[in-house]
Amino acid sequence: MWVSVEDDLFNSIYNKLKSNPIVQNELDGRVFDSVQKDAVYPYIVVGESNVTNNESSVSMTEDVGLTLHVYSQAVNAHETRELIKFLGLILNREIKLNNYEFIRSRIDDQQVITDIDQYTKHGIIRLLFKYRHTTKY
């Protein structure tokens, strides 16, 4: 039986952001796993994920898509764009995980929109990671 890399990758990215000195300085560590009610802006949400696996009798690889969101109420979208760019720079690279071999990562999509309240700037970046399993359970 193979155990998905999804949870380990999600937790690693979440913890990497929470402990990042730039996130600590600029956002006071405001990284969450869901949208916040009565939030202090800006903040980051490590959000939705999906997994596509390719299993054979002797190996397993997974493509994991992970979407991150940035919310800002700055006057313009510059802050949001800068934070999205920052997320791409620090996360679009190898993330070492026990029992999994990193193959590649890439930015699948990124965009900045204005939320329905017409004030909140919402940045979205979707990253794709490919891992090979090194352990079968």
Across the structure, where does each feature detected by a protein language model lie?
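Polar helix-capping/helix-linker motif
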Residues: 19-20, 93-94, 121
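Short, charged interaction patches at domain edges and termini
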Residues: 1-16, 51-63, 101-137
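Small/polar-rich, solvent-exposed N-terminal microdomains that initiate assembly or binding
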Residues: 1-50, 82, 89, 98, ...
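Short, flexible active-site-proximal loops enriched in glycine and acidic residues
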Residues: 95-101
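Short, solvent-exposed beta-alpha or beta-beta edge segments that form flexible loop/patches at the rim
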Residues: 27-74, 106-111, 128
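Mid-chain, well-packed structural core segment of small domains
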Residues: 72-93
